[in-house]
């Protein structure tokens, strides 16, 4: 990959962004020197690393800030036994701390093989970290805690310095001495504490003169009383320096003992910084890992140039190498042709550098050994074209080096010279590159190349869409449709006299008019196809939504039906258990009574009645067993139209309306409903067979005691009373009662009339009448239920 191509495709701008995003000095150097690879294994390996980093960042957030310098020279020094300076030691300490933080961040790498391997290379040297932390506050300040000896020396220095201050303060407070001083203050020259003495009183303050003012009027004197103390401090300062040197040597030796582990950890951090920088950029750009191939196929979906603002970039779909090898793009200036070239070329470079591309996940790219781009002299996305000579100089180099593993991008091929000669040259160059096996994308204004692309094998036309109504490009790439100049339409829309426009149209050749008409028809058909595709997509989504709603409703119905069934069985069990308990107690009492009366026949009859009740009690369990068995019956093998069948999922009997299809689906009519069911969901119903959903007489008898013979609705409104009566009649009928009493009172007769109007329409009511004397007369209604 030559530097001219990298710059023309603005690859350098992307790596500069990544360099600035990287935190460590080595990672920044990596991006500064990053160039695309041509080795398939290396590219796939790098993309897989970034993919792990990308997925990990999405799931667990961004990593710690990996800001550190290159510590390899310092590690080499420590290996040789040299003493490291504080800055070098602190940088090594930073790497060790970041290793610890990164290990913690990478706590969930079980499903991330690369990150797991990196985590294992990160050392946890708490001993070294602790030693560095207790030694340094900054690179310029070593703590007293660095060693007991250092603390002792510094404590002595501080005490002596305090003595000097006390002596000097005593002197400046002395009235006899104050008159010899310029000011009653202590001044510092170098590391000495001195008094500012007036020059004329030099001999009045005994001491050593260390400095004087610029005018010579003030002498800075160290009194003799402080000199001895200062000498002691000087000796201690020398000892302090020696102790610090010893501490630095000690820490350097400690680092040297772990040099290999630290170096391994350093390299792991650098690689992690690189990978996570690429991953975070991919997240910000909504980029994805491209699918790699070696067959020369490019298929980009929703590709977005990363240097165009997100709110302005228009995604493009472009493919090359499968059905055609040369794509000729035509269209207006600033319509997106150059952006398309740069997008394809840049994406190939990014992919071969192990960087995700801002496109849909299933986008494909080929690994090219060479990529050439002729896009003008340092032309940015919307700058003017280069000269003909500059174009030809680049194209000559391209034709000499192109082969079947080459991608060639040519912007405005043949431009800058006579149109006829330029078009001829363009045809020859494109034909030559096609015969070499290169993959080529070229932009042009020449109409002849549109026809050329239609005639040549493995060539295809494309255009950048232009809205003649708004007079603006849409930046959409339309493959298979050559571009139109739109000059006459645009001129007319801008207000050019219609006569001039028609005159210009008359100057067009018939060939040009026919071509323009064909292109227009193709574009209309494309728009119709897009509209139909969009309509089909919407209809598909609606159908999927309806299907999902149906499935959800069916599931809800089945769940509710099962809940009601289980509830009914549980209620029946409770009634049975309660009845069993009452029966047991009753028989105990009767047995005692019979024994006392010595009536063996009575006792025998009671025992028989008990056995009968026990048989009744087992009916619920028998019903459950029958229901379970019904679900395991074999499905029908031979089905005929009109056959009576039981549909399990609806718990109902119906009739076959249509025979099963190849998938076993058929239509069954249940009542007024026609349902599509599967053959596995139905079973045969023989004549006289009673399904488990039919109520048996035994079960009815068991529930007789649970429903009263009458219901009292006095004092209620007509609506509330009717609701209660309706439920009561259902319960009474289910329990086997055939005559019940509704107590509504006499009153005004409104409630009685409302109830009787309701009873006239009730399907369970056979007849009803007033109560007789002793039954409640007109205050009640006696209801006879159907069998």
From Swiss-Prot:
HAMAP family assigned: MutS2
EC number per UniProt: 3.1.-.-, 3.6.4.-
UniProt-recorded name of the protein: Endonuclease MutS2
GO BP terms: mismatch repair; negative regulation of DNA recombination; rescue of stalled ribosome
Enzyme class label: hydrolase
Entries under Gene3D superfamilies matching the protein: 3.30.1370.110, P-loop containing nucleotide triphosphate hydrolases
Family listed: Belongs to the DNA mismatch repair MutS family. MutS2 subfamily.
Residue ranges of every copy of the Smr domain listed in the record: 711-786
Its job: Endonuclease that is involved in the suppression of homologous recombination and thus may have a key role in the control of bacterial genetic diversity.
Keywords: ATP-binding, DNA-binding, Endonuclease, Hydrolase, Nuclease, Nucleotide-binding, RNA-binding, rRNA-binding
Signal peptide residues on this chain, from the entry's feature table: none
GO molecular function: ATP binding; ATP hydrolysis activity; ATP-dependent DNA damage sensor activity; endonuclease activity; mismatched DNA binding; ribosomal large subunit binding; rRNA binding
